Design a protein with these regions (language model features):
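Accessory cap/linker subdomain of secreted extracellular hydrolases
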Residues: 32-35, 48, 110-111, 119, ...
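C-terminal, loop-rich substrate-recognition/catalytic regions characterized by aromatic stacking residues
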Residues: 32-34, 240-282, 377-661
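N-terminal cap/lid segment of alpha/beta-hydrolase-fold proteins
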Residues: 43-85, 516-522, 535
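Cap/lid segment of the alpha/beta-hydrolase catalytic domain
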Residues: 81-157, 204-207, 211-213, 372-383, ...
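Alpha/beta-hydrolase fold nucleophile elbow
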Residues: 160-173
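Short glycine-enriched nucleophile-adjacent loop
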Residues: 175-186
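Short beta-strand/loop motif that positions the catalytic acidic residue
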Residues: 328-330
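Active-site-adjacent alpha-helix of alpha/beta-hydrolase-fold enzymes
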Residues: 338-359
Length: 661
């Protein structure tokens, strides 16, 4: 239960209703609860970490840092007490709750990261993004990080204890803002470490995901759930004239975490029109479906992949040069590994020679931001990918030693430019480049007798195109889409299970086409981009096509490796007007490349499944040719995949030649 709030009044701030809370004068009694042994152990551990931190650090909490527009961002600063000189800064900026006090538990939060940084001679600065917790202003996802990020770095480097060098680190929303700010080339920002950072990548090469909002032009539905909790234009805020002591006291009294009721997303994602999903779960008004007084204007669901609004906020695009050393962490089952790899390669190709040589990447076989949760038997979904552990913390501190302190770092010196995990074989491999050095491509062509439907059909992947066209046909009904089973993703509650699962139970559906290769005669490493080209037809004006790639074991189990989708209206490009389909015509569509790494042992097969939906990982195309997001009814599409000499539908994958694993 939250403490009672007295003298509540309402104020208007930036055109948005906010509640200003006057602080109670006296202490607030915590609710009496019986602690479990686990909670008692946690409290004891955290208290010990806090004591250690206070013994070696100058602790300066709830420092309000003024931005150029006068709004103040809340920061907690930890720096070594007995430093012999000025120190470098590790900067963590986040929309999430870093408050030092766990109000519910009545104890400090886990300060082990801050303690580790101070022990190694760093200042460590936590800062909340604009419009979150104790930070002032109006929140917009990646809306104003360019100016706020630059101003924060300038503030840090101007402090008397600073050596003038700042390095950024963090995962997910704590990473996404970094790239666009790095591209501002702010003096003092010496290096960056981005982890699971796809929502910060706007446009890069063929990818127009605009911060993970799209894939192939289809909406990635993860942000509906995420924004339900995070778009907090109506929230409790404190008066602007409070002292630092007042704010510290308040931070031990008030838990400012948004705690909305958890909706039944299994039902909510089905709501039509799509723009009303937030309303259907009684979510707050905000940037998802409402026009807002923010730099990009809000109303994200109504945009298209090349809408001007995407270029007014804090996304990084490939015309923004990055010329700072970078340490990049990615994972095979994250939301967007391929745009992230494309961003890494783009920086290596466009930075100055010295900086291009200072870009390092690690690609792990884990879910979103789960790097340090790898174990001796790392299980992703139902697939055991073996011992995927790695000393990420050691590498990050070694990286900062090199680029913030200017000292030798043996761990960095021995680190390969690209380190990637090969699933199946379950081993780390390294390469000077991505795709791996020496990689070649192999093509397999789709064929069938016209009955590739289901796991039990006659679809095959063969070495040469040809034969008579017997197109494989299926019905795509938006009211009965293929539901998501595994894959890469994030943040959709219990509605979607991400990772790798045996796909066979789902492949009995008649609206899924299945194509199998012959068993591999020898072990084969497939590491790099996979590109699929299909020749398709439909009686709908617009529809989607999807594919999923699997490793089929000798016992018949088929574990998914990667997947993709393409909205047909964007098949000629996201920066071009939409193009529509005509009944009876066959169209070539090439999906954006999607990356993975897997070792196919002898006797295993490569399987590709084709359909027109993967919901609710991606939104449903209602097949009408309309806006989709504001439509309440769809139509059934009669879709087909063609494969003959004139229509060489194929999958192209990347093979790394080598001997036995």
């Amino acid at each position: 239960m939250r403490p009672a709030l007295h003298h509540v009044r309402t104020a208007l701030s930036v055109g948005v209703a906010s509640v200003c809370l006057a602080l109670v004068a006296g202490p607030v009694a915590a609710q009496q609860t019986v602690l479990t042994p686990e909670q008692k152990a946690t409290i004891a551990k955290r208290n010990d970490i806090e004591r250690q931190l206070e013994a070696i650090a100058v602790v300066d909490r709830k420092v309000m840092v003024k931005m150029r527009d006068g709004k103040r961002m809340a920061a907690d600063v930890y720096r070594p007490k007995d430093a012999s000189g000025k120190v470098p800064t590790i900067f963590v900026r986040t929309p999430y709750n870093f408050n030092f006090w766990d109000v519910k538990l009545g104890a400090p939060r886990d300060m082990s990261r801050q303690l580790a940084a101070v022990k190694r001679g760093y200042a460590y600065v936590d800062m909340n993004e604009r419009g979150h917790y104790f930070s002032e202003g109006n929140y917009e996802i990646l809306g104003a990080p360019l100016s706020d990020g630059v101003d924060a770095i300038r503030w840090m480097t101007s402090q008397p204890w600073s050596n003038g060098k700042v390095g950024t680190t963090g995962c997910s929303s704590t990473a996404e803002w970094q790239m666009a700010v790095v591209a501002q080339n702010t003096p003092g920002l010496a290096t960056f470490n981005v982890q699971g950072f796809g929502a910060g990548v706007g446009r890069v090469g063929p990818y127009y995901e605009q911060g993970n909002w799209y894939r192939g032009g289809a909406v990635q539905m993860l942000f509906i759930d995420w924004l339900y909790k995070e778009q907090n234009q109506v929230r409790p805020v404190f008066p602007a004239n409070l002292s630092q002591a007042d704010l510290i006291r308040a931070s031990k009294m008030f838990d400012l975490d948004s705690q909305p009721p958890e909706p039944d997303w299994d039902k909510a994602f089905w709501v039509l029109p799509e723009k009303d999903i937030m309303k259907s779960v009684d979510g707050p008004k905000g940037i998802f479906a409402d026009a807002m007084d923010v730099p990009t204007g809000g109303n994200m669901i109504a945009r298209t992949p090349n809408s001007p609004a995407w270029y007014k906020g804090g996304l990084w695009h490939d015309d923004m040069k990055i010329d700072k050393p970078g340490l990049w962490f990615m994972s095979w089952f994250d939301v967007s590994v391929s745009p992230n790899l494309a961003a890494y390669n783009h920086v290596r190709a466009t930075a100055s020679k010295e900086i291009a040589d200072q870009q390092y990447a690690i690609i792990a076989p884990v879910l979103h931001c789960a790097y340090t949760r790898a174990t001796e038997h790392t299980v992703i979904g139902d697939l055991d990918v073996g011992d995927a552990r790695f000393d990420y913390e050691g590498l990050v501190f070694g990286w900062f030693d090199k680029f913030l302190k200017g000292v030798d770092s043996p761990i960095v010196d021995k680190q390969p430019k690209v380190m990637y995990y090969v699933m199946g074989e379950n081993k780390w491999r390294d390469s000077p480049t991505w795709p791996p050095a020496g990689a070649t491509t192999r093509e397999l062509f789709l064929t069938s007798g016209g009955k590739a439907n289901t796991l039990y059909g006659d679809g095959k992947l063969v070495d040469a195109a040809g034969g008579t066209d017997h197109p494989d046909q299926f019905l795509y009904d938006p009211a009965n889409p293929v539901t998501t089973l595994g894959g890469g993703g994030c943040c959709q509650g219990t509605a979607v299970k991400f990772g790798s699962f045996d796909q066979n139970p789902q492949l009995a559906r008649n609206d899924i086409l299945v194509y199998d290769s012959e068993p591999f005669k020898e072990g084969t490493e497939v590491s790099g981009p996979i590109t699929v080209t299909l020749y398709v037809s439909s009686d709908a004006k617009d529809t989607d096509f999807t594919f999923k790639v699997m490793d089929v074991y000798p016992d018949g189990r088929a574990f998914n490796l990667t997947e993709n989708i393409q909205r047909m209206r964007y098949r000629e490009g996201y920066d071009k007007p939409p193009v529509w389909m005509k009944d009876g015509e066959v169209y070539k569509v090439t999906f954006q490349p999607i990356d993975t790494s897997n070792f196919f042992f002898a006797g295993h097969k490569l399987r590709m499944a084709v359909s027109s939906s993967n919901f609710p990982r991606f939104d449903r195309n209602l097949n009408t040719g309309g806006n989709n997001y504001d439509e309440a009814k769809g139509v059934i599409a009669h879709n087909a995949v063609h494969h003959d000499a004139a229509h060489p539908s194929k999958i192209t994958f990347t093979v790394v030649p080598r001997g036995k694993p």
